[in-house]
Amino acid sequence: MPITVFDTKGIPATRRERIEAAVVAAGRQLTAPHEAWIAADPFRGGFKVLITGPHGFERTVTFALDDEAAVIADRVWQTLEE
């Protein structure tokens, strides 16, 4: 599993599993391990995903709390390809 979600804070339990699964699914094609932290973004009413990886890779992606899993996975994948 190339993306490991280390922590999820402030996300309702009913949505946490779906969000974590989408983030992990986005990284299945990666060749190097990456890490992710997911946290609620109370100022924007959504959540942020911080992704780190080799060679100083660090990106943050912001989502609405009601974004579909496919949207989350796609945007995380696009961010990983940058």
Spans of model-derived segments:
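Negatively charged, low-complexity tracts enriched in Asp/Glu with abundant Ser/Thr
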Residues: 1-37, 70-82
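Residue-level signal for the start and early helices of compact helical domains
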Residues: 38, 52-54, 68
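Short beta-strand micro-motifs enriched in acidic
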Residues: 39-43
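A short, exposed loop/beta-hairpin motif centered on an aromatic-Gly-Thr core
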Residues: 58-65
